[in-house]
Amino acid sequence: MKNDLFLRVLRGEKVERTPVWIMRQAGRYLAEYRKLRAKVPHFLDVCRNPELACELALQPLQRFPLDAAILFSDILTIPDAMGLGLSFVAGEGPQFAKPLRSSAAIESLTLPPSGSLDYVFAAVSATKRALNDRVPLIGFAGSPWTLAAYMIEGGASKDFAFAKSFAFSQPQAMDVLLTQLTCAITDYLRGQIKAGAQAVMIFDSWGGVLPYWAYEQFSLPYLKKIVAAVHTVAPVIVFTKGGGLWLAAQKTIGAAALGVDWTVSLAAARKIVGESIVLQGNLDPTFLMTDPKTIRQAVAKTLADYGNGHRYIFNLGHGITPNASPDNVAAMIEAVHELSPQYHQ
């Protein structure tokens, strides 16, 4: 492989500089992405077309010297395959036609039918071929709690109050759903790895809305089961948005790396998780709306916060926003390339 910095860090090897990639690096901030999406306005039509998904995954690599590519898809492909009727409404985000609003609905749910997610695996294979060993390819899935939250809530939410109240009042039914999703996600990630993904990431996007005890009940144990089943075939990154206070618990998941958002000090996180776990993050995406000088200063602070060592991957603390400037993205990557080698002596 021409550039294996990302994988070398996950394996615990020494590297000459800090690798960098961006969550949602294929997205609306790129004019070429908007141009393609104008031709194919329905988001799921793009995800279900391996050639288009491959093209979008490669777009940021054609523009920026990133150290990894990530599959172009969505975390809600699994519940869609389970028959909940996923659609994306402009300005409102994802919606399910058949949300799970009772224990009976959960009991009647079945795993995704065989072949229903083959389009995702085909997109992985197509992207891997097109990369031609330029950089590693990351596969991904949502966490059991995050998928369950969407499936019960029926769509996007600021606080997922309905999903939380269901979990609190019907924990046994919630366990049935989370256990089923754990099986589906495990198979899904292993399928992506078989198709060519060299690392996988689990997005626990809404773990941070839970109280600490509820995180330990409704998210943590299921993440552990998935990682235990997957980490032997590829390194796993786990990212719980808003979960920085729970790093002591997260270090028990068994993941090769933990993502952190911008509310967390990398130095403090490093002390908590120890030297055997990679940290990934955590620049506030808002910096990409500023200017190159400000961004360079922020990158310098972020790198210094982690300090010397080889167990760190530079990223944002959440997905890149549509109003980010591509020129500022280039400035951020350049700053990482120029400023990080001093920490790898």
Swiss-Prot record:
EC number, as in UniProt: 4.1.1.37
Site (Transition state stabilizer): D74
GO cellular component: cytosol
Binding residues for substrate: R24, Q25, A26, G27, R28, D74, Y150, S205, H318
Superkingdom, natural source: Bacteria
Keyword Cytoplasm (UniProt): yes
Subcellular location: Cytoplasm
Protein name (record): Uroporphyrinogen decarboxylase
Taxonomic source organism: Dichelobacter nodosus (strain VCS1703A)
